Amino acid sequence: MNFPQNLKYTNEHEWIRVEGDIAYVGITDYAQEQLGDIVFVDIPTVGETLEAGETFGTIEVVKTISDLFLPLAGEILEQNEALEENPELVNKDPYGEGWLIKMKPADASAAEDLLDAEAYKAVVNG
């Protein structure tokens, strides 16, 4: 299982990569593995400003739908349009082409309070 060191993580299995005043959000390798084959990603919150921990969308797999939680407060700028035609990108490349949203964090420094790779690995391994 992959735990990139340059990302921050949540207990709900989302990752965030801050690049200046923009951040990318996705689900972790562990999450996609546990979910199974992703068939649909729904991000109805583009253009909205949400608080950390709020639901920003859902991921649908063959037998269930899972909520997606925002790691930091901020505005959802765009969703990954490639997932409309190819939702399996989340399974194939969760930290790269399978990113879910691009956002503008209200306070990007708040990412420092999230889990680093080692702390997230401890969550996954129980």
UniProtKB/Swiss-Prot annotation:
Organism superkingdom: Bacteria
Domain Lipoyl-binding stretches: 22-104
Cofactor binding comment, as recorded: Binds 1 lipoyl cofactor covalently.
Pfam families for this protein: GCV_H (PF01597)
Cofactors named for this entry: (R)-lipoate
Record-linked InterPro entries: 2-oxoA_DH_lipoyl-BS, Biotin_lipoyl, GCV_H, GCV_H/Fam206, GCV_H_sub, Single_hybrid_motif
An example Gene Ontology CC term for this record: cytosol
SUPFAM superfamilies the UniProt entry points to: Single hybrid motif
PROSITE patterns in the record: BIOTINYL_LIPOYL, LIPOYL
Keyword Aminoacyl-tRNA synthetase attributed: no
A biological process from GO: glycine decarboxylation via glycine cleavage system
Record PTM N6-lipoyllysine, positions in chain: 63
CDD domains xref list: GCS_H
Keywords on record: Lipoyl
Similarity-based family: Belongs to the GcvH family.
Function: The glycine cleavage system catalyzes the degradation of glycine. The H protein shuttles the methylamine group of glycine from the P protein to the T protein.
Subunit and interaction comment: The glycine cleavage system is composed of four proteins: P, T, L and H.
NCBIfam families in UniProt: gcvH (TIGR00527), PRK01202.1 (NF002270)
UniProt-recorded name of the protein: Glycine cleavage system H protein
Organism: Bacteroides thetaiotaomicron (strain ATCC 29148 / DSM 2079 / JCM 5827 / CCUG 10774 / NCTC 10582 / VPI-5482 / E50)
